[in-house]
Every structure is written in structure tokens, then in C-alpha cells.
């Protein structure tokens, strides 16, 4: 409502959104923040001839395109495998724990402080998720 009023003021005309357009917007996974929603509404308003944002207009902005498929999850590595070196074992635990150090430490039977030390000494670069 707020964004619609703001965009309408910028364009100098009243804007409305159909129920089907709202449902489409609500069902979309917005990876960014409110600016992504605002940009989509601005593009939709510009493409709307009469100030009514419909599902078809929102679709033209690419909102209903399917998200790219996620990469297949890596198979879990047996952390007790004796063939793994220390670095591989720590990285495998981090991957299984979603790169959360405390969870990886639990998987390896370590304290968070111990795994942090291993990450530093083994020169493992932490992924930002």
C-alpha cells in the first residue's frame, strides 16, 4: 500500500493492483529486500497503461519465472573415514553443518574453539552464507 502510493505520486497517477497480481507477488521468493519489491512495482506501473497493475504486467517483469534450479546436494562424507586428512575432514564437517562452526564442531566431537583453531591453522576460508 505504502509503496503503491509512493510510486503513484512519482508517476502522477493513482495506481491499483489486482488480486491476482498480489497473489503472484506474495508467492514469489524475494531474495533481496524491500527494494526488489519496489523495483518490480515501479516497472509494473510503468508498463501499465491505465494505472492498474495486473498479473500479466507483473509477469512481464520476470517475477513468475522459475528460480534457477538449486545445485544437487553433495553426498555426505563419512567423517570417520581414515583416508581423509584433517583439512578434508574439517571442510566436510563444515559443509554438512551449513558452514556453521559450532555445528561442525559437534559433528567432529570438538569444541567451537578447537574447530576455529583448526580452521585458522589449516588455512580454510569460511564461506559466507
UniProtKB/Swiss-Prot annotation:
The keyword Repeat does not apply. The keyword Transcription regulation applies. InterPro entries: Homeodomain-like_sf, HTH_Fis, P-loop_NTPase, Sigma_54_int. Residues 1-46 form the Sigma-54 factor interaction domain. GO terms for molecular function: ATP binding; sequence-specific DNA binding. PROSITE patterns: SIGMA54_INTERACT_4. Residues 101-129 bind DNA. Pfam families: HTH_8 (PF02954). Keywords: Activator, ATP-binding, DNA-binding, Nitrogen fixation, Nucleotide-binding, Transcription, Transcription regulation, Two-component regulatory system. One of its GO terms (biological process) is phosphorelay signal transduction system. Interacts with sigma-54. PANTHER family: PTS-DEPENDENT DIHYDROXYACETONE KINASE OPERON REGULATORY PROTEIN-RELATED, TRANSCRIPTIONAL REGULATORY PROTEIN. Required for activation of most nif operons, which are directly involved in nitrogen fixation. This is Nif-specific regulatory protein. The gene is nifA.
Amino acid at each position: 500500500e505504502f509503496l503503491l502510493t509512493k510510486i503513484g505520486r512519482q508517476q502522477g497517477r493513482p495506481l491499483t493492483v489486482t488480486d491476482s497480481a498480489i497473489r503472484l507477488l506474495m508467492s514469489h521468493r524475494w531474495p533481496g529486500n524491500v527494494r526488489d519489491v519496489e523495483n518490480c512495482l515501479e516497472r509494473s506501473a510503468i508498463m501499465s497503461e491505465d494505472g492498474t497493475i495486473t498479473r500479466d504486467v507483473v509477469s512481464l517483469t520476470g517475477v513468475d519465472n522459475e528460480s534457477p534450479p538449486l545445485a544437487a546436494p553433495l553426498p555426505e562424507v563419512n567423517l570417520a573415514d581414515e583416508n581423509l586428512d584433517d583439512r578434508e575432514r574439517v571442510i566436510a564437517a563444515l559443509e554438512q553443518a551449513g558452514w556453521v562452526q559450532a555445528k561442525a564442531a559437534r559433528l567432529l566431537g570438538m569444541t567451537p574453539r578447537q574447530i576455529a583453531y583448526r580452521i585458522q591453522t589449516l588455512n580454510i576460508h569460511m564461506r559466507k552464507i
